[in-house]
Curated annotation (Swiss-Prot):
GO terms for cellular component: cytoplasm; nucleus; protein kinase CK2 complex. Probably not expressed in wild-type flies. In males lacking the Y chromosome, it is testis-specific and constitutes the main component of star-shaped crystals. GO terms for molecular function: protein kinase regulator activity. InterPro entries: Casein_kin_II_reg-sub_N, Casein_kinase_II_beta-like, Casein_kinase_II_reg-sub. Interacts in vitro with the casein kinase 2 alpha subunit (CkII-alpha). The relevance of such interaction is however unclear in vivo. There are multiple copies of the stellate gene in fruit fly, encoding proteins that are extremely similar, which makes their individual characterization difficult. Thus, most experiments probably do not discriminate between the different members. This is Stellate protein CG33237. Gene3D superfamilies: 2.20.25.20, protein kinase ck2 holoenzyme, chain C, domain 1. It comes from Drosophila melanogaster (Fruit fly). Belongs to the casein kinase 2 subunit beta family. Unknown. In males lacking the Y chromosome, its strong overexpression leads to the appearance of proteinaceous star-shaped crystals in the primary spermatocytes causing meiotic drive, possibly by interfering with normal casein kinase 2 activity. Induction: In wild-type flies, it is strongly down-regulated by double-stranded RNA (dsRNA) interference mediated by Su(Ste) transcripts. In males lacking the Y chromosome, the absence of Su(Ste) locus, relieves such down-regulation, explaining why it is strongly expressed. The lineage of its organism: Eukaryota, Metazoa, Ecdysozoa, Arthropoda, Hexapoda.
Amino acid sequence: MSSSQNNNSSWIDWFLGIKGNQFLCRVPTDYVQDTFNQMGLEYFSEILDVILKPVIDSSSGLLYGDEKKWYGMIHARYIRSERGLIAMHRKYMRGDFGSCPNISCDRQNTLPVGLSAVWGKSTVKIHCPRCKSNFHPKSDTQLDGAMFGPSFPDIFFSLLPNLTSPLDDPRT
């Protein structure tokens, strides 16, 4: 932890503040603490204590290890909930995830996508809803793609279909 780190910060505050983690949204404490949302995640009681502490304790031995994966998997679940979709919608509308590099997409906003739901398989990509292509993000991020999963853009746009228009068909 840097000496400039606020002593009242939680692990979540610290983690979300790391350069490259701007694609992530804050998962509310009540969502994190709900045991239903923790099902299937290992070491949840120990990690929960670390990520929810008001002060980061670097002597815990867990710092930035299993917490990153655990928070990432909770995040993947959260962004599929109503509150999570609202948070990601806000980020999408602000253009936080970047825009499509395809010139015919006219700087269409993109969404983060994972090529796999399995941790450690690939880093996050950005998905353009107009051309349906995935690209490497311009931002300096090494987030695991499982933090979003391969179905997130489909879920997002099936619930919010008016956010994009398809590419013009040159045959019409």
